[in-house]
């Protein structure tokens, strides 16, 4: 991980994103905010944060890969993390959007997260078709 980049941890949900901004040289995020999960709001955030180097990080989930694709179209580095491989400290059971976003930023900076390959739209469509067929047959 590039220690000179700002890491932006994101907890992505259908309606909004909680964003934790961890600049270089800081141990904790300096800002945590919630934005709408809409194209214009994401573009505004990305434009604001890409004045320097930034990497956007979020866990794969039911919202898919659209946020990663949009950030990529804007010229940003965006990585999707495997949630099953995210380290969890014993006793750390309280889950909030803010804590999840902060944790992603810190763990990515520390090099403790596993990045996944984002499927193409065609691969994703084929996967959806296979799953729908399996559901219909079952």
Positions of PLM-derived features:
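Phosphate- and other anionic-substrate recognition elements at nucleic-acid/protein interfaces
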Residues: 1-138
């Amino acid at each position: 991980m590039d220690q000179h980049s700002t890491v932006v941890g994101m907890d992505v949900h259908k309606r909004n994103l909680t964003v934790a901004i961890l600049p270089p040289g800081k141990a904790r995020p300096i800002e945590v905010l919630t934005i709408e999960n809409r194209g214009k709001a994401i573009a505004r955030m990305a434009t604001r944060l890409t004045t320097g180097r930034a990497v956007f990080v979020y866990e794969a989930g039911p919202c898919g890969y659209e946020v990663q694709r949009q950030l990529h179209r804007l010229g940003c580095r965006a990585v999707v993390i495997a949630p099953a491989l995210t380290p969890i400290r014993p006793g750390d059971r309280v889950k909030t959007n803010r804590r999840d976003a902060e944790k992603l930023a810190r763990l990515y900076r520390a090099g403790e997260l596993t990045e996944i390959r984002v499927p193409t739209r065609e691969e994703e469509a084929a996967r959806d078709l296979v799953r729908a067929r399996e559901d219909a047959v079952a």
